[in-house]
Amino acid sequence: MSTLQAVKYIRGKLEVLDQLRLPHEFHYDEVSNRTEAFDSIYTMRVRGAPAIAIVAALGLAVELHNGSCTASSAEETIGQIEEALDYLKESRPTAVDLTNAINQLKARIREVGSTATKEAIISAFIEEAEKIFEKDLKTNLSIGDFGAEWLRAQVGASPEQQISVLTHCNTGSLATSGHGTALGIIRTLQAKKLLHHAFCTETRPYNQGSRLTAFELVFEGIPSTLITDSMAASLFRTRKQEKNIAAVIVGADRVVRNGDTANKIGTYQLAVLAKHHGVKFIVAAPTTSIDLETETGDGIKIEERKKEELTQVTGAVIKPDGTVDESSKVRVATADQRINVWNPAFDVTPAEFIDAVVTEKGAIEKGPDGKFDFSQILPERWAKITGA
């Protein structure tokens, strides 16, 4: 198990790793209230759908634990907490884990009821937030196991016939409570001696692949190679047979009812390339990332980011001798600052390009009708939404 932690928590204190400083600096920010949690998420100092939900929940839990609630009645307490949760929801609207966590927390404090004491409501909220944190690690370990077994069955991965994979963005310990989703499958493949090599994209424009995934892979000694986003087609065409490249494994910020998947920008093009080159395309996501209320990807709200993320970049200074000065950072322009920029943070991969959605409850494949059916793994939610 990796010792990398995006989030450090004990009751009353939350520390969040500032991932904008990686890989050159390891620094934790203390998050003590909803405003700091919102800012940490919005500025992408923390990212990854599970980690975002965890930071939002625990950030407010710390604030409440430390006595910020000014309500004088149970009803007012519930109202203040729900107002704070609605505020946090806007920090990253595409990530359905955040919405699901907020709904779960609201349901819990309402369950305690308006007749309970203020202290009982706050205590129930804190305990529920901690459950979200604790459950995520178990979920990720299960995703890793199911993903590795699916690849063993579908592409013949074995210690004698190891496979190589490509991943996009960052979906490891830095995006979750630990182990990871897509990168968790890669970790499990490595542990079971099924992995030959892992390729990771740099993931422009925020470079989560080069800054974070490459960092995690090197940290754990997993054989790996970094490529630019635009090299994927050439990689499949020239190295697929030599390296036995069998799958692209990505995470998800939202998987909707028909299987359409919102993930980091650049995911869709990888899915198209994988299909063309006969490479399996796998989405790894907890069931909390599955949004049954939204029928297709057309209903997903896509966040757009500021233009400077494309036209400027920050990095550590390289000394004349070629070594990295980790204490010295510089921000430079990479384009004419007057150019117009379109910068969506996510894209939507249609279900037709996805071979499997791997969750903590198993790997789901499309049925004979070419559609994903999540009713078997989410029967209660499915029945509630569809009436079936």
Swiss-Prot record:
The record marks C169 as: Transition state stabilizer. GO terms for molecular function: S-methyl-5-thioribose-1-phosphate isomerase activity. The keyword Metal-binding does not apply. It holds the Pfam family IF-2B. It comes from the Eukaryota. One of its GO terms (cellular component) is nucleus. The active site is at D253. Its EC number is 5.3.1.23. The keyword Amino-acid biosynthesis applies. GO terms for biological process: L-methionine salvage from methylthioadenosine. It is found in: Cytoplasm; Nucleus. Pathway: Amino-acid biosynthesis; L-methionine biosynthesis via salvage pathway; L-methionine from S-methyl-5-thio-alpha-D-ribose 1-phosphate: step 1/6. Keywords: Amino-acid biosynthesis, Cytoplasm, Isomerase, Methionine biosynthesis, Nucleus. It catalyses: 5-(methylsulfanyl)-alpha-D-ribose 1-phosphate = 5-(methylsulfanyl)-D-ribulose 1-phosphate. Catalyzes the interconversion of methylthioribose-1-phosphate (MTR-1-P) into methylthioribulose-1-phosphate (MTRu-1-P). Belongs to the eIF-2B alpha/beta/delta subunits family. MtnA subfamily. This is Methylthioribose-1-phosphate isomerase. It comes from Fusarium vanettenii (strain ATCC MYA-4622 / CBS 123669 / FGSC 9596 / NRRL 45880 / 77-13-4).
